[in-house]
Amino acid sequence: MGRIIAIDYGRKRTGIAATDILQMIANGVATVPSGEVVKYLSDYISREPVDLFVVGLRKQMNNEPSENMKYVEAFVTHLKRTIPSIPVTYYDERFTSVLAHKAMLEGGLKKKKRQDKGLVDEISAVIILQAYLESKKYQL
């Protein structure tokens, strides 16, 4: 069984999270400049087995795609071309940044660390992945 990778793609930075080998727990892996994500993922899959990429689906409250969704779709097209052997799925990422900030606050991180946008992106990827895992658990 391979890992599941979650990707919180942004125009500047991208948060990445991965499951454990049993696909039960999500952990933050890295925040990568968005132009380097596909290379980072290619390197990652050369070291670790990966079964699936889960990409944050950017939607507005009315369920319409957000303005940034076009960048996410372009990234996913590039990812699928570069790594065609691993399927890609989307998962709703609404409120993940808010939840990430809340988790950081509740975790007692100092203000300077909470302002680290890269850390917010990585935690957002963890939240996307954990929510995806929870949704699959209840479909069994």
Swiss-Prot record:
Gene Ontology MF, one: nuclease activity
GO cellular component: cytosol
Gene3D superfamilies linked: YqgF/RNase H-like domain
Keyword Lipoprotein tagged: no
Keyword Nuclease: yes
Recorded coiled-coil stretches: none
Enzyme superclass (EC): hydrolase
This protein's UniProt keywords: Cytoplasm, Hydrolase, Nuclease, Ribosome biogenesis
Alphabetical list of Pfam families matching this protein: RuvX
NCBIfam families in the cross-refs: RNAse_H_YqgF (TIGR00250)
Family that this chain belongs to: Belongs to the YqgF nuclease family.
Protein name: Putative pre-16S rRNA nuclease
Biological source species: Parabacteroides distasonis (strain ATCC 8503 / DSM 20701 / CIP 104284 / JCM 5825 / NCTC 11152)
High-level lineage: Bacteria, Pseudomonadati, Bacteroidota, Bacteroidia, Bacteroidales
